Regions:
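Acidic, aromatic-enriched beta-alpha/helix-loop junctions
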Residues: 44-70
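Short N-terminal "domain-start" leader segments
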Residues: 2-35
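Short aromatic-glycine-(Arg/Gly/Cys) micro-motifs in beta-strand/loop hairpins
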Residues: 25-51, 77-82
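Mixed-charge, Lys/Arg-enriched low-complexity segments
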Residues: 65-92
Length: 92
């Protein structure tokens, strides 16, 4: 699957358009990143801030609050610590 970095406005548009199969909150190195996955297009959109840095959250609750604020009610949580991956579907 191809990964594209997109800004906040485009990420929000993906949420509103319904063109996303899954939203993923993934933990890397102690912080949380967001992805919007479009399987039909074979693209995973990675949220990036305007200045080019990756947008991150320090807690899962903060990332969940952001997603809720843009209208996302269900997302998948993945933890990548110590080479173990866990998947947890959360609905809010």
């Amino acid at each position: 699957m191809k990964i594209e970095q997109i800004g906040m406005a485009a990420f929000r548009q993906q949420a509103e358009s319904g063109g996303v199969d899954e939203f993923v909150v993934q933990r890397f190195g102690g912080v949380y990143h967001l992805f919007a996955v479009n399987r039909r297009a074979g693209v995973s959109y990675f949220l990036q801030e305007r200045r080019g840095d990756y947008k991150t959250w320090l807690s899962l609750d903060c990332a969940a609050a952001f997603l809720s604020g843009i209208g996302v009610s269900r997302f998948t949580v993945r933890f990548e610590d110590n080479k173990h991956a866990e998947k947890d579907d959360r609905g809010h």
